[in-house]
From Swiss-Prot:
Residues 195-220 are annotated as: Disordered. GO terms for cellular component: extracellular space. This is Nodal homolog. It comes from Xenopus tropicalis (Western clawed frog). Belongs to the TGF-beta family. Homodimer; disulfide-linked. Interacts with, and is inhibited by cer1 and gdf10/bmp3b. The gene is nodal. Residues 1-18 form the signal peptide. SUPFAM superfamilies: Cystine-knot cytokines. Keywords: Cleavage on pair of basic residues, Cytokine, Developmental protein, Disulfide bond, Glycoprotein, Growth factor, Secreted, Signal. The lineage of its organism: Eukaryota, Metazoa, Chordata, Craniata, Vertebrata. Residues 19-278 form a propeptide. GO terms for biological process: axial mesoderm formation; axis elongation; determination of left/right symmetry; heart development; involution involved in gastrulation with mouth forming second.
């Protein structure tokens, strides 16, 4: 974790995007000492593959690394307590006609197997002396051809000062897209903008006035005065539906196998690559008796947790994982005594096997030193052409035991 904190400090020396108050109040501004030692980190919005990623995503990632989940969610919408993925989408097109703004996003990267918890529309605006309402129409577009109307809201984005980034809660609009796909009814969202440094997000409320979607005109005058596609971002906080991953299939395996950035050639060159199978055991603990334990292998250390540094560059994943570049996953090694005791937190099955081993040594093999408690890891990486912040479960060994 010390490495993570050191590497990620650069983001706060060069932040240019605002964050909602629930994040801002919990992210300390650090000095530039780390950046000076690592000049390559100063250009924080570009990866070594020359692909951009938003500063906001880096800020969010670092906040999750430095703060626990309870502190992160306190005072904010309870929906943020439940997300496991954050996806950022830059606008594909920004158009205007009088007091109407038309914003188009490619929602193809959004998984229909995910449940939307929170959606933020973040718009960067210049500091100007102006105050008038604007109707914002939000569309889904794919390859510049398909235009699906998602909804509209009315706001006065110039009415407040502070951060140039104005944030609007558009969860209600996009929930229809997540639930109904193409069958979306027109909704009208009215919102009163508040400064990002105030409540963190504009309040919003729907009016019962559904109707036909506004006429989409690709020849509208581009918003050269106010907006650019790089200054309009949709941030989606989602969670995979329980039924999708009910088997417990490791989420990172699926992600890595589908990534176009994984260097499989490097992996194939590594010597001694073999496939291993491991047993799945019950996780019910049993209070041990007073039978004295003995060592199976004289002189071999007992079951314990040891370091295992995973460097993503070394395993060919460096081109798609933004952060962390490496982390300590830990591993378990050592011998398990016969019979097992409470110190090694065995399952019922493992304890019975150790007792059989004590009395009938040739009948069963020795219990194995394995992880019994795991913790997740937050990772920022490219998924397709988008940047995703995702929490992958069972990435770090917290405790070892015998099974």
């Amino acid at each position: 974790m010390a490495f993570l904190t050191a590497v990620l400090c650069f983001g706060f020396a060069c932040m240019v995007q605002g964050v909602p108050s629930w994040l801002e109040s919990r992210i300390p501004l650090l000095g530039s000492s780390v950046a000076s030692k690592h000049p390559s980190l100063l250009d924080g919005n570009r990866h070594h593959r020359d692909m951009k990623y938003p500063f906001y995503m880096m800020q969010l990632y670092q906040n999750l690394v430095m703060a626990n989940d309870t502190g992160l969610a306190r005072g904010h919408n309870t929906a943020t307590k439940e997300y496991d993925t954050v996806l950022s989408l830059f606008a594909k097109r920004c158009m205007e006609s009088e007091k109407r703004w038309t914003l188009s996003f490619d929602m193809s990267a959004v998984s229909k197997s995910s449940e939307l918890k929170l959606a933020e529309l973040r718009i960067q605006l210049p500091h100007i002396e102006m105050s008038h309402n604007v109707t914002v129409d939000v569309y889904h577009t794919r390859d510049g051809e398909e235009n699906l109307y998602l909804g509209s809201f009315e706001a006065n984005p110039f009415s407040t000062k502070g951060s140039p980034w104005k944030v609007f809660n558009v969860t209600r609009i996009l929930q229809h897209y997540f639930k109904e796909g193409q069958d979306i009814k027109s909704e009208y969202l009215r919102t009163k903008d508040r400064a990002e440094r105030g409540s963190g997000m504009s309040s919003a409320e729907f009016l019962d006035s559904p109707g036909d979607s506004p006429q989409y005109n690709p020849h509208h005058t581009p918003l050269r005065r106010y907006l650019s596609t790089e200054g309009v971002m949709l941030v989606l906080f989602t969670k995979v539906k329980p039924s999708v991953n009910h088997i417990g299939f490791p989420s990172l395996i699926k992600t890595a196998e589908s990534s176009k950035y994984v260097d499989m050639e490097k992996a194939s060159r590594m010597p001694g690559i073999r496939r291993h199978r491991r047993n799945k055991n019950e996780k019910h603990h049993l209070s041990m008796g007073s039978i004295p334990s003995r060592h199976v292998d004289n002189g071999k250390p007992l079951c314990r947790r040891v370091d295992m540094i995973v460097n993503f560059e070394d395993i060919g994943w460096g081109n798609w994982i933004v952060y962390p570049k490496k982390y300590n996953a830990y591993r378990c090694e050592g011998a398990c005594p016969i019979p097992l005791n409470e110190t090694f937190k065995p399952t019922n099955h493992a304890y019975m096997k150790s007792v059989v081993k004590l009395y009938q040594p040739e009948k069963v093999e020795c219990p194995l030193c394995v992880p019994i408690k795991m913790s997740p890891l937050s990772m920022l990486y490219y998924e397709g052409d988008e940047v995703v912040l995702r929490h992958h479960q069972e990435m770090i060994v917290e405790e070892c035991g015998c099974s």
